[in-house]
Amino acid sequence: MPLKVDRSSLESGVEVITLAGSLTLGRDAQNLESSVEELIRQHKTRIVLDMSEVSFVDSAGVGILVGSYGKVVTAGGKLRMAGVTPRVLNVLRITKVDNLLALDENLAASLAAI
């Protein structure tokens, strides 16, 4: 299933990017990267990725997550991931990036932590 990327701004100043589908090599995954870069350019660097509807992630997707995290942190911001599914979490653990990324059980936990 192609990746769907939706963005919303909360009154608290947090930006939520909701993802649905597969985060894999291709234009769809680049849309996520572009969305994060656009937010950084707008100085909106408190970002939560709602991953609860992501069914699969490949190595390119992991790279985009890590790269996005690095860009946000370099810009002085915070990026958290909410509701990572067990299948995706397994990939993040295998690649050892689960220790780098800020992962929360659900969106409410990410919003409270950011």
Describe the residue ranges of each PLM region:
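Short beta-strand/loop segment at the start of cytosolic alpha/beta domains
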Residues: 1-18
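Residues that form or immediately flank small-molecule/cofactor binding pockets and catalytic motifs
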Residues: 10-12, 86, 108
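A charged, well-structured terminal subsegment
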Residues: 102-114
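Amphipathic alpha-helical interaction surfaces in cytosolic regulatory modules
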Residues: 22-101
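General small-molecule cofactor/ligand-binding pocket signal
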Residues: 6-8, 82, 104
